[in-house]
Amino acid sequence: MASLKFTKMEGIGNDYVYIDSTRNDIRLTPEQIQKISDRNFGIGSDGVIFIRNSKQGDFMMDMYNSDGSSSEMCGNGIRCVAKYIYDHGLTSSKNPKIETGAGILEVDLKIGSGNKVDLVSVDMGKPVLVPSQIPVVWKNEETIIDQPLEIGDKNLKFTAVSMGNPHCVIFVDDSDEFPVRGIGPLIERHSIFPKRVNVEFVTIRGKDHLYQRTWERGAGETLACGTGACAVMVAGNLTRRSGKDVQIDLRGGTLRIQWQESGNILMTGPAREIFSGEIEI
């Protein structure tokens, strides 16, 4: 067995195991990722993120869900990657460019006490609304806004958005009372979503103030989802439920999401290092 160094980090409760692969090209099997992510027999996390060198950006974020499947992007994860590379001296730049499965993203680091990163803003790019590019198997290529979706005995309405990964946003009266763990997996694997989908169940709390629960593709319900929060803001604006500068509460904390004049989405939130260690794999 080999010993693997790691750092566990979280962004508003969305926790991943981070592995610095900038010096050695570390690769793990899906089974090893499942073992590491297991909350009873491993470190416990929503997945594993490798920090790698990049030919296109300053660094690369290589992300895997807790079931071992790969994922294009994680908004909370990229904030933690940004904090790691600065706090651990891999870069002195406060605006590094990070390569993801959703493209190159630029981050803006807010430095706090002890010269450590407190907050991170990420330019998440433009939302994708064309069904075939999300992807959603749909009757045409028109934007899917508040369209009917029948799941069991529930007649829901959904808005489809990609923020580099697919999202299905559903507004409900009370997210806390909604059966997320029952309905979430049924929507995740619905036949209209060929690559599966992340599902957000959203309640309006006030003007430009939303509350979100997330069923993540490949991970189940998580305390937070950054790309999901971006998709929620887009869906809220498209359905005239909210504006373009929104506070979104999640079970793990709060994010500020802004739809800028450029058309890009800006996400701002915290990132925190929990502990580091070694694990036998």
From Swiss-Prot:
Main EC class the enzyme belongs to: isomerase
Site (Could be important to modulate the pK values of the two catalytic cysteine residues): 167, 216
Domain of life: Bacteria
SUPFAM superfamilies: Diaminopimelate epimerase-like
EC number, as in UniProt: 5.1.1.7
UniProt-annotated binding residues for substrate: 14, 65, 75-76, 165, 198, 216-217, 226-227
Single Gene Ontology BP annotation: lysine biosynthetic process via diaminopimelate
Keywords from the named record: Amino-acid biosynthesis, Cytoplasm, Isomerase, Lysine biosynthesis
Source organism (scientific name): Leptospira interrogans serogroup Icterohaemorrhagiae serovar Lai (strain 56601)
GO cellular component: cytosol
Reactions mediated catalytically: (2S,6S)-2,6-diaminopimelate = meso-2,6-diaminopimelate
Stored Pfam families: DAP_epimerase
Active site: 74 (proton donor), 225 (proton acceptor)
Record's subcellular location: Cytoplasm
Subunit structure: Homodimer.
Pathway: Amino-acid biosynthesis; L-lysine biosynthesis via DAP pathway; DL-2,6-diaminopimelate from LL-2,6-diaminopimelate: step 1/1
Function text: Catalyzes the stereoinversion of LL-2,6-diaminopimelate (L,L-DAP) to meso-diaminopimelate (meso-DAP), a precursor of L-lysine and an essential component of the bacterial peptidoglycan.
Name of the protein in its database record: Diaminopimelate epimerase
Chief subcellular location: cytoplasm
Family that this chain belongs to: Belongs to the diaminopimelate epimerase family.
GO MF term list: diaminopimelate epimerase activity
